[in-house]
Amino acid sequence: KKGLAPLQANSFISSVALRHSRDMLSGRTPFGHDGFHERIDRIRKHLGPIRVAAENVASGPMSAREVVDGWLHSPGHRRNIEGNFKLTGIGLARRGDGMIYFTQIFTR
């Protein structure tokens, strides 16, 4: 819609996003963006230069569709989704009670 190329899924970025979701689920890191710069540094070491990066996180007993709908109704999250990024990775971690932690990382 915005004249941008489609995002390309990247398995390494997804592994970094998954680790963050698991860390939030386990309580090793609080819910949110703590450690964002370290995650981007890890991606940079593996993939090379990154000019810009962003991250969306969510938690709750909800579907991926509900998470994306929520992000699209939040100006900051929507800006990331519609941003001029090239690569993305998504990771989610689920607890036995149905609570799910979602992380999506965007890079260019």
Per-segment meaning from a language model:
Residues K1-R108:
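Functional surface patches built around histidine and acidic residues
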